[in-house]
Amino acid sequence: MTLSSHVIGSGSPATFLHGFTQTSHSWLELVEHLPLASTLVDAPGHGESADGQRSLTQIGDDIAAIMPTGCLVGYSMGARMALHTALQHPHKVTSLVLISATAGIRDADERSARKNSDDTLANHIEDVGVTTFIDEWLSQPLFAGLNSATNQRQDRLRNTSRGLADSLRFAGTGTQEPLWDQLRDLTMPVLLLCGTTDTKFHSVALEMA
C-alpha cells in the first residue's frame, strides 16, 4: 500500500507519524518552525490513506517505502508504527523519536482483553459515525486541557468511521506482538518523550530506556 504523504520545509529529512484519529495535518503547526524537510504521513485508515486493513508489520514496510532515510518521529499509535519501521528497516532510520510509546502488552491475557476492547470500540465507531465518535473521543480526561483551537477537531473529522474502525482492528495496541526483547536490536539513537503529567507513559518510557 502506498501511504499518502507530503513534504513541508527544507533541510535534514524527518518523517512524522500521527496518533489515532489525527492526520498528517496534525504536525503542521510544529514542523513549520523546524529547519527540516518534514515528510508528514497519513497512517492507514486516516486522512487520505483510506485503507485501514494493514497490520503493524505491513505498515512498517509501507512507511519505509515512502520515507527518506533520516529521523523518524511517532506519537502514540504513530510511535508504535515507527518502532516497527525502525526494527524492520533500520537502514532507513538514522534516529528515532517515540512520543507516548509502548513496546506492546507482554501478558497474553491482557493483550487479548485489549484486542477485544479495541474490536468493541471499532464496532461502536461504525455504529455512531465519525462525528459523534470524535466528540466522544475528545471528551476524555486526556484531552481536558485542549480547547477548540488546539484539539484539531475539524482535522479529525476528515477521517471516516470505517477507516478508524479498521485501524483499531488491524493495528490497535491489542494486535501488537510484544517488542520488548527486540528493543536491544535498535542501533540508532532513540529519544523517548511523554507529557509532564502522563504518569502511565512516563513509567513505560523508563522501562523501555
Could you tell me what each predicted segment is?
Residues 29, 84-88:
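Active-site signature of alpha/beta-hydrolase-fold catalytic machinery across serine-
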Residues 159-207:
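Conserved serine/cysteine hydrolase catalytic core
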Residues 57-71:
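Conserved acidic catalytic loop of the alpha/beta-hydrolase fold
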Residues 87, 94-125:
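Flexible "cap/lid" loop of the alpha/beta hydrolase fold
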Residues 3-50:
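Conserved HGGG/HGGXW glycine-rich cap/lid loop of the alpha/beta-hydrolase fold
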Residues 74-78, 82:
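Gly/Ala-rich beta-loop-alpha elbow adjacent to hydrolase catalytic centers
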Residues 72-74, 99:
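Short beta-strand immediately N-terminal to the catalytic nucleophile in serine-hydrolase-like folds
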Residues 119-125, 136-147, 167-174, 193:
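Helix-loop "lid/cap" segments that line or gate small-molecule binding pockets
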